[in-house]
Amino acid sequence: NNNIFQIFNEIAEANLNQSKPTVVCFSAFPNTEMQSKLNLSKIKNIRIRIITRSGNLYNENELLRLNMNEAKSIIVLNDESVVDFNIESTLLVTRKILSDVKVPVIAQFNNSENIDIFSRSDKNLLPVNNSSVMASITTQAIRNKEISEVILDFLDYDGDEIYFFPPDILAGKTFDQCKLQVMNISIFGIFTN
C-alpha cells in the first residue's frame, strides 16, 4: 500500500518520546521485497524498528505470529499486492484473535458498504474510507480515535472551510451514521437543543 511509508513516518513522529518502538508490517508481499522497498523508502525518522512478515492475510495461524494481543493498536490497510483483497475477511480473523482484548483496530475500506456493519459490531474498530483518508489521519487515529478526524482537519490548511448548517438529512441519526451520510465533508460536532 502506498500509504505505508507515510504511516511509518507518522508513527515515528508520534512516538518520539518512546525508545525505539516496534512496528510489524505483515503482507502477502514476499519478505525480501518488503525489505528492499523499506531500504529504498524515505522514512524520515529511523527511531522506529520495522519488522516485516510475509504470509496469508486470511490465515489465523499466520496472523497469530504477530502477537496482536500485545499491540497498542492495529492498522489494516488495503493490500494492493493481493488480487481481490478482502479486508472484511482479514478483520473477521483479527476479531477472532482479539476476542477479549481491547486493542484499537484502524481499517482502511475501499468502499463504505460494510463500514456501518463492522462499526456497530466492534466498538474497537475505527473504519476509514479509502477515498477520503490520508495516512496521517489513519495514524493519528491510533492516539485518539474520537477526535483525530477533527484535529487533522483543522491542521490541514489546504483551503478547507468550516460551515454551520442545519442538515435535514442528518436529523435523528447518530454521529457515526452522519459521518457515513456525508463522505466529502468532516463532521466534528452535532448541536442539539
Predicted feature descriptions by range:
Residues 1-193:
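Cytosolic regulatory regions of ion transport systems
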